[in-house]
Amino acid sequence: MKAFIVILSIAIVLLLIVSIKETSAKDCKQECVKRYTNGDFTNFFKVEYGPERRGGKCYCEFTCRVKFYIHLKHEMN
């Protein structure tokens, strides 16, 4: 029974980590588009999110060969 609780706890923690990363990647994409095209997704090519301590690093790339990095800061509630 204890092993089941441990496995369940680990699964919940991993699920939380994945959901935080997905949310951060979505925030990254929105921030890239907002900063470069004022919300227009037509020239958007790709975004990569790398988690860091107290935030993350976004790599933004557009079809017109514009590439840049953004540092996101996560606010702690």
From Swiss-Prot:
This is Putative neurotoxin 2. It comes from Scolopendra mutilans (Chinese red-headed centipede). Contains 2 disulfide bonds. Expressed by the venom gland. GO terms for cellular component: extracellular region. Belongs to the scolopendra neurotoxin 3 family. It is found in: Secreted. Residues 1-25 form the signal peptide. Keywords: Disulfide bond, Neurotoxin, Secreted, Signal, Toxin. Coiled coil: none annotated. Residues 26-46 form a propeptide. Its main location: secreted. GO terms for molecular function: toxin activity.
